[in-house]
Design a protein with these regions (language model features):
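A glycine-biased, small/acidic residue-tolerant capping/turn segment at secondary-structure junctions
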Residues: 248-250, 282-307
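A short core secondary-structure module
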Residues: 85-130
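A structural signal for short hydrophobic beta-strand segments in well-ordered beta-sheet cores
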Residues: 76-80
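Internal helix-loop-helix
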Residues: 1-45, 49-54, 97-104, 227, ...
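A short, Trp-centered hydrophobic/proline-enriched beta-strand micro-motif
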Residues: 54-62
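Glycine-rich phosphate/pyrophosphate-binding beta-alpha loops
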Residues: 67-68, 94-100, 176, 312-317
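C-terminal helix-coil-helix/basic helical segment that borders enzyme active sites and/or dimer interfaces
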Residues: 228-276, 289-290
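Glycine-rich beta->alpha junctions and the first turn(s) of the following alpha-helix
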Residues: 129-231, 271, 312-385
C-alpha cells in the first residue's frame, strides 16, 4: 500500500492531464474506497483485483437532481424483495464522473424510505441504464453521465457494510476525495506560476522583458505566496493523517474501517484543504492568464483550458460554500464535546488580549506572534458568535 503522503504527491503531479486526473481520482478514491474500507471479503475478492488492474473502471453515484450537497436526502429508493435475495432500486443520479465508462458503481439509496445505504452495482444490471454524456465547460476528456434505475435488480449481497450506514461510507470517502482535490489544485497553481513566469521572461514590451515590470512581479509573487500557503496546509495535514493511520494495527480485521474512520477525524482539515486549495488555484490561474494577456485567452495556450478545467473544483466534492459550513459545524460540535480544547483556550483569551503575545527575539518571532494573535482573535470571535 502506498502511504497517504505519496498519494498526495501523485495527485499533485497528475494535474498535467486534468481529465485523466479526474478519472484516476475516482478510480483510486471514492469509486473504490467504499469497497476497500467497508466491503466484505467476498466483495473485495470479486471486484478489487479487476479494479486495481484497470480491467474495471469505477464510479460513485451520490448526487441526484434534487439533492447535491445534502446527499442524505436522496430520493433513490431500495426495497428488499420478499425472498430477500435482491434490492430493487428506483431513481436517478446525475453528474457522475466515469459514469459513461464505468463497469462497477457504488450507489447510494434509501432503504425503507429513510435508511441511507450503499450498494455495488455492475454495468449491465437488469433495470440499470446510463444516460447521455454531459456537455461540460471543462474536463472535456472525462466522462460525466446520468445513472438511471428503473426497478434495477441488485443482489442482496451487494449491500455495502450495513443498512443505514451510507452516510458513514459516503462522507469518510469524501474526506479523502476533498483532500486529493486540494492536491490537484496545488499542482494546477504551480503549473500556472511556471507558465506565467516563463511567458513574462520571454515577452518583450517597451524595450525590455515584462518580468521586470513591478506589476508583473507583484502578480507572480502573490501567486507564489498563496500557493506556498496551500502547499504547507496540504502536507501538514497529510502528515498528521498518516501519523494517525500508522497507529492502526494492520493485522486487525477491521483495519480499513478504522482507516476510513481516521479520515473522519480530519474532516475539518480536509474541507479546509479543498476550499483553500480550489480558491487558490482559481485565483492563481486567473492571474496567470492575465500575465499572458491576449494570448492567455487563446485555447492554444495552456492557461485557457486550465481556466475552464479548474472552475469545477469549487463545486464538486461539496461546494466550497457547503464545505465552509462543514468546517464551522464540526468545530462547534468538537467544541461542545471537548474533543477540541476550546474551553481551556478561551479561558486564556482575556490575559492574552490584555498582555499581548510573549514575543522573543528568535528567528520568525514576529511572524509567530502574528499567527498566535490571529488564532486568539479567531477563537474570540468564534466564542462570541
Amino acid at each position: 500500500d502506498l502511504d497517504k503522503i505519496t498519494t498526495a504527491i501523485v495527485a499533485e503531479a497528475l494535474v498535467q492531464s486534468p481529465s485523466f486526473a479526474v478519472t484516476w481520482a475516482v478510480q483510486t478514491g471514492i469509486g473504490s474506497l467504499p469497497i476497500i474500507w467497508f466491503g466484505t471479503d467476498e466483495q473485495k475478492n470479486k471486484y478489487l483485483p479487476k479494479v486495481s488492474s484497470g480491467e474495471f473502471v469505477c464510479a460513485y453515484g451520490l448526487t441526484e437532481p434534487s439533492s447535491g450537497s445534502d446527499a442524505t436526502q436522496a430520493k433513490t429508493s431500495a426495497k428488499l424483495t420478499e425472498d430477500k435475495k435482491h434490492y430493487i432500486l428506483n431513481g436517478e443520479k446525475v453528474f457522475i464522473t466515469n459514469g459513461g465508462i464505468a463497469d462497477v458503481f457504488v450507489v447510494f439509496a434509501q432503504v425503507d424510505g429513510n435508511k441511507f445505504s450503499a450498494f455495488i452495482l455492475e454495468k449491465g444490471t437488469e433495470g440499470f441504464s446510463i444516460g447521455r454524456e454531459e456537455n461540460k465547460l471543462g474536463m472535456k476528456g472525462s466522462s460525466t453521465a446520468q445513472l438511471i434505475f428503473q426497478d434495477a435488480k441488485v443482489p442482496a449481497e451487494n449491500l455495502l457494510y450495513k443498512v443505514g450506514k451510507g452516510a458513514t461510507i459516503a462522507f469518510n470517502c469524501l474526506n479523502i476525495g476533498r483532500f486529493k482535490l486540494g492536491c490537484s489544485c496545488l499542482g494546477g497553481s504551480k503549473q500556472a506560476i511556471t507558465t506565467a513566469s516563463q511567458y513574462a521572461l520571454d515577452r518583450k514590451a517597451f524595450g525590455s522583458s515584462i518580468s521586470k515590470f513591478d506589476a508583473i512581479q507583484k502578480k507572480i509573487a502573490e501567486m507564489a505566496i498563496l500557493t506556498f500557503a496551500t502547499d504547507s496546509m496540504i502536507y501538514r495535514t497529510i502528515g498528521l493523517l498518516q501519523d494517525e493511520i500508522d497507529l492502526i494495527d494492520k493485522d486487525t480485521p477491521d483495519y480499513y474501517i478504522q482507516m476510513g474512520e481516521a479520515m473522519g477525524k480530519y474532516a475539518i482539515e480536509t474541507s479546509m484543504v479543498k476550499v483553500f486549495g480550489s480558491d487558490c488555484s482559481h485565483w492563481v490561474i486567473d492571474q496567470g492568464l492575465q500575465v499572458l494577456a491576449g494570448y492567455g485567452y487563446l485555447e492554444e495556450y495552456s492557461l485557457a483550458p486550465a481556466y475552464r478545467d479548474d472552475r469545477i473544483n469549487q463545486i464538486w466534492e461539496g461546494t466550497n460554500e457547503i464545505n465552509r459550513q462543514i468546517i464551522t459545524g464540526f468545530m462547534m460540535k468538537k467544541a461542545l464535546t471537548e474533543e477540541l480544547p476550546f474551553r481551556d483556550a478561551i479561558r486564556n483569551i482575556d490575559s492574552f488580549l490584555n498582555e499581548g503575545p510573549s514575543s522573543d527575539n528568535s528567528e520568525f518571532g514576529k511572524e509567530f506572534d502574528s499567527v498566535e494573535t490571529a488564532k486568539k482573535l479567531g477563537l474570540y470571535l468564534f466564542n462570541e458568535s
